[in-house]
């Protein structure tokens, strides 16, 4: 199973690269995470073309948006288990300063939000990678996640 994060933004601060790399390297080889950075453009429509081109063929798409459906970590773990069992690759989309173009949200299989708060895309990237790792640890019975 391959998890891809297509995120608008480049030249992230060092702390973003450090944090995302730390969680990515903890993931097993059969559940890898790849981040594809898209250079910001003047309009979401122009970004949408670049984002769509970065989505791996056959991947299911989840658009992250502040108006998306709330998720829990437990639900993410359940989803992750299902995707692995069914052999799906998943791509998460993180928009830039103006969010995702409506066409990307319409074509996505789901639209989620990471928080009721509006997050900068750098923070959303770190939060998503951490939650994917946390979901994986739940499935493995690893003590990282505590309730």
Curated annotation (Swiss-Prot):
Its main location: cytoplasm. Keywords: Cytoplasm, Methyltransferase, rRNA processing, S-adenosyl-L-methionine, Transferase. Gene3D superfamilies: 3.40.1280.10. Coiled coil: none annotated. GO terms for molecular function: rRNA (pseudouridine-N3-)-methyltransferase activity. GO terms for cellular component: cytoplasm. It comes from the Bacteria. InterPro entries: Alpha/beta_knot_MTases, RlmH-like, tRNA_m1G_MTases_N. It catalyses: pseudouridine(1915) in 23S rRNA + S-adenosyl-L-methionine = N(3)-methylpseudouridine(1915) in 23S rRNA + S-adenosyl-L-homocysteine + H(+). Pfam families: SPOUT_MTase (PF02590). It is found in: Cytoplasm. Its EC number is 2.1.1.177. It is an enzyme of class 2 (transferase). S-adenosyl-L-methionine binds at residues 64, 95, 114-119. PANTHER family: METHYLTRANSFERASE, RIBOSOMAL RNA LARGE SUBUNIT METHYLTRANSFERASE H. Belongs to the RNA methyltransferase RlmH family. Specifically methylates the pseudouridine at position 1915 (m3Psi1915) in 23S rRNA. Homodimer. This is Ribosomal RNA large subunit methyltransferase H. It comes from Polynucleobacter asymbioticus (strain DSM 18221 / CIP 109841 / QLW-P1DMWA-1). The gene is rlmH.
